[in-house]
Amino acid sequence: MTAPDSSSAPAPLAFGGKPRVYPMRLYGDPILRRKARNLTAADTLHVPGFEPQTVREVADTMLETMFEERGVGLAAPQIGLPVRMFVAVEYADDEEENEGQETPLRSRVLREYVMLNPVVKVINKKKDKSYQEGCLSIPGIYEDGVPRARQVRVDYTDLDGQPRSIEAEDYLARVFQHETDHLDGKLFLDHLPADITEDHRKDLLRIQQASKNFLAQLSEWDKAQRHLKENL
């Protein structure tokens, strides 16, 4: 999910080794419509295009990716991992402009969250439509009126493998619901009338083409790596 003041730009495309940030999976990528599987904190994860990493390493890189993309949350399917994991942050609301320069997002962080196998339970069923939503996988598209439960509890596992629970309301509750949706193959546009998605048809087609281009590059890189291994 994007921060309210976000102007996201794609991370540079570079495969191999341990990444500083991950390239973003975009609207149209089949992985964004898959239901993710559970994981444990002890798992080794393999983000396509990169070396295997621990769950903690992946979480750290996801946070770095999220900050670079000026987001407020990022789910594992958005980096090509079909596992039930997301990262999110709370930012300070009192951003001050300094001679026209954007305040670095990291300096505004109040709290970071890394959630494995999150389960959202609604506390207050009243729907809230007062916040604008966007998504790092659907860059440049924002909509008001996405209905979300006003208050939720999230039960999850932390990076040490311990069970945790947190209650959230208003915007943070929205973030947790948005990211958990990703783990079930849902996007925020799915909660809106079809004519709103149709209004964004031109932009969505452009994003889908960018997604196809990325997947083609990833496939070519993967073929090249397999060829190298076969000829060692």
UniProtKB/Swiss-Prot annotation:
- Gene name of this polypeptide: def
Which Pfam families does the entry mention? Pep_deformylase (PF01327)
Q: Which reaction does it catalyse?
A: N-terminal N-formyl-L-methionyl-[peptide] + H2O = N-terminal L-methionyl-[peptide] + formate
Biological role stated in the UniProt entry = Removes the formyl group from the N-terminal Met of newly synthesized proteins. Requires at least a dipeptide for an efficient rate of reaction. N-terminal L-methionine is a prerequisite for activity but the enzyme has broad specificity at other positions.
- Give the cofactor binding note: Binds 1 Fe(2+) ion.
Q: Which InterPro entries match?
A: Peptide_deformylase, Peptide_deformylase_sf
Task: Give residues annotated as binding Fe cation.
Answer: C135, H178, H182
Q: What is this protein called?
A: Peptide deformylase
Q: What does this protein need as cofactor? A: Fe(2+)
